[in-house]
A protein has these predicted regions:
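Terminal substrate-recognition subdomain of acyl/acetyltransferases
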Residues: 1-3, 82-86, 92-94, 106-107, ...
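Conserved RecA-like ASCE P-loop NTPase motor core of nucleic-acid helicases/translocases
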Residues: 54-66
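Conserved beta-strand in the GNAT
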Residues: 239-249, 278, 293, 298
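Walker A/P-loop nucleotide-binding motif
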Residues: 31-43
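N-terminal pre-P-loop "Q-motif" helix
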Residues: 8-27
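Conserved beta-hairpin
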Residues: 229-248, 255
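Pre-Walker A (Motif I) flank of P-loop NTPase domains
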Residues: 26-31, 230-231
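Conserved acetyl-CoA-binding loop-helix of GNAT-fold acetyltransferases
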Residues: 42-47, 296-318
């Protein structure tokens, strides 16, 4: 019995049934289902799983978001996180990617190429979604894409006035994607007062950010309106918005707090990149510098590849540097490198939601910013060989490996031994330490060789710190004790 003829007893509604019939008879290829919230998109994916004859795997940025799919799929539901799926050799007849817009395009391509049939689903026009920018940006990667849309609500009545009120209040409209901003582009700044003096312009910027960035939320809208330390640059083409840049002030921490962050004694809220420069970098005073982090940057799909994004970056100003934190892909890094950014950090593990390592980069603006950027980049180059081997991912910087311990290594090792520096941050210095000493250090050597399975995580970390302290004291007792005394003072400040 065709699904389109099934009775209305918790089974597919007409729109869902028509799409299900098409999917169940689909030859090899990629299909995409987009819908606003409440249209039964996840239920449809679960029904597809329960109806197919072969095997299937489901992936999504978060497993919790697939509960509806699991409920409809029953025993046919098999979930793997994007990073785990990428690293596996799993084969199946179908791949279901829920909220596909949250997964970087290059990773989405890699995953889709491994399965004969792929269904991409994503929410549009809502705080969980990314607008029709998903179809323009991601689905253009797949030739012969079959596109389907659900428009009839299943959680509430069609034409619900509350849904329209919420959509209007939270600027869920994405009609801006249909309009091409034509003409010469000029760059201007956007001040918070724009929401009173010219709300249409502020709305245009927010709608562009929603279309370009997954999960731009009403909280972001509130921040745009009244949060301190926010700066906006806009690329205007006539009356239309062609591009937008959102910067957030960071850094400027007191020296005492910056040192405590470096040592792992403190983790105050906010200051994403500024704190990371201290906590994962080599300078205890890194977080004292002032910078502006790129929170969002977007260019209208019809005006991309014209250099507008680079112009927005060049127009930006900051105290010491501009910074950016992003899920690393070759494509994204190519853009940031063209803007003049320098890679200063690569995360130690893939994010389960995106399958990407977190990368951080700086664009120095002041002399102090140049010094910090050069120091952080040189550290990354010097450690690159060890970090790449440990992560299993090549870091796109010059290999400047040195096996000899230097003063930066001594400070790093003391921070690990006598404070709370992370193992992943200190792993290159620890590798050089093992090359420099002729001592057993069984926990350290076993950890490096991947053979330490007899310890719990906390117990092993304590043992690693203990052995590092012992090695430093054997190498140079006065030096190790002076560093220990200095670092221990950094946990006390006004």
């Amino acid at each position: 019995m065709p699904l389109s003829n099934m009775p209305a007893s918790g089974e597919p509604q007409r729109e869902q049934a028509e799409i299900l019939d098409a999917l169940l008879t689909m030859p090899a290829g990629v299909a995409a289902v987009t819908a606003p919230r409440g249209r039964g998109k996840s239920a449809l994916a679960g029904m597809l799983l329960s109806g197919i004859q072969g095997s299937a795997v489901v992936t999504a940025p978060a497993k919790g978001a697939t509960d509806v799919i699991a409920r409809f799929a029953g025993e046919h539901f098999h979930f793997m996180a994007p990073d785990a799926l990428l690293a596996s050799t799993t084969e199946a007849d179908w791949l279901i990617v829920d909220e596909a817009a949250a997964i970087p395009g290059p990773l989405l391509e890699k995953l889709a190429s491994r399965f004969p049939r792929v269904l991409l689903t994503t929410t549009v026009q809502g705080y969980e979604g990314t607008g029709r920018g998903f179809l323009l940006k991601f689905c253009a990667r797949f030739s012969g894409l079959r596109r389907y849309t659900l428009s009839t609500p299943v959680r509430w009545a069609a034409g619900c006035p509350l849904e329209r009120t919420v959509a209007n209040a939270l600027l869920f409209d994405d009609a801006l994607i249909d309009r091409k901003p034509a003409g010469e582009v000029r760059l201007t700044s956007l001040e918070p007062g724009i929401w009173e003096s010219d709300p249409t312009r502020g709305t245009g910027v927010y709608e562009l950010l929603c279309a370009a960035h997954y999960r731009t939320s009403p909280l972001d809208l509130r921040r745009m309106m009244d949060a301190p330390g926010q700066h906006f640059a806009v690329a205007q083409a006539g009356a239309e918005i062609a591009g937008a840049l959102w910067l957030v002030e960071e850094g400027g921490l007191p020296p005492e707090l910056s040192r405590a962050v470096w040592a792992g004694f403190r983790r105050p809220r906010g200051n994403l990149v500024a704190q990371s420069l201290a906590a994962h970098g080599g300078s205890p005073l890194a977080a004292t510098l002032k910078g502006r982090r790129v929170s969002r940057i977007a260019v209208h799909p019809h005006r991309q590849r014209e250099g507008i994004g680079q112009r927005l970056i060049r127009s930006a100003s900051g105290e010491d540097y501009l910074s950016v934190s992003f899920g690393y892909t070759d494509e994204l890094w190519r853009f940031w490198r063209q803007c003049g950014f320098v890679l200063v950090r690569m995360g130690s593990h893939r994010e389960a939601s995106s399958g990407c390592y977190t990368a951080m980069a700086l664009l120095p603006l002041s002399e102090a910013g140049h010094q910090l950027c050069e120091q952080a980049h040189q550290r990354l180059c010097r450690d690159m060989r060890v970090l790449s081997a440990w992560n299993g991912e090549k870091i796109p910087v010059t290999d400047s490996w040195e096996a000899t311990l230097n003063s930066d290594d001594w400070l790093e090792l003391a921070g690990f031994a006598f404070a709370h520096r992370a193992f992943s941050t200190s792993v290159a210095a620890l590798t050089r330490l093992l090359l420099a000493v002729d001592m057993p250090l069984p926990a350290l050597r076993g950890k490096m060789e991947g053979n330490m399975h007899d310890f719990g995580r906390k117990a092993l970390l304590a043992k690693l710190r203990e052995e590092t302290a012992y090695a430093l004291e054997r190498l140079d007792y006065p030096r190790s004790q002076q560093l220990k005394a200095d670092i221990m003072q950094w946990q006390f400040f006004q």
